[in-house]
Amino acid sequence: MRHRKSGRQLNRNSSHRKAMFSNMASSLVSHEIIKTTLPKAKELRRVIEPLITLAKTDSVANRRLAFARTRDNAVVAKLFTELGPRFAKRPGGYTRIMKCGFRTGDKAPMAYIELVDRPAQEAASAE
């Protein structure tokens, strides 16, 4: 029985999943919008939202926790200098998932996941 087993397996072992979501979270922080499959986007929300909440209060301990999850100093710097202050007044709900059709090769449902309140010039260049 799979009672109380949360999260998607995505046909990967646990270390592959952890590495994949760490990389995807780093990409989302860097580019503020990424295109991926819908199940991965929904699961990425569970990784990125606590990171942004952590970045709202800047401390050495929080920076170390964020680095442990992303393993990238540039991403940690952007989290705490740009994204934390940007979302300081917002109580959660930092990401938006927009469905964008199906992938041509295997008809997998695709989606964009983006950070809300993104600067307008980046939104125009992503299109």
From Swiss-Prot:
GO biological process, one term: translation
Molecular-function GO terms, alphabetical: structural constituent of ribosome
Record carries keyword Ribonucleoprotein: yes
Keywords in alphabetical order: Ribonucleoprotein, Ribosomal protein
Domain of life: Bacteria
HAMAP family: Ribosomal_bL17 (MF_01368)
Family per record: Belongs to the bacterial ribosomal protein bL17 family.
UniProt-recorded name of the protein: Large ribosomal subunit protein bL17
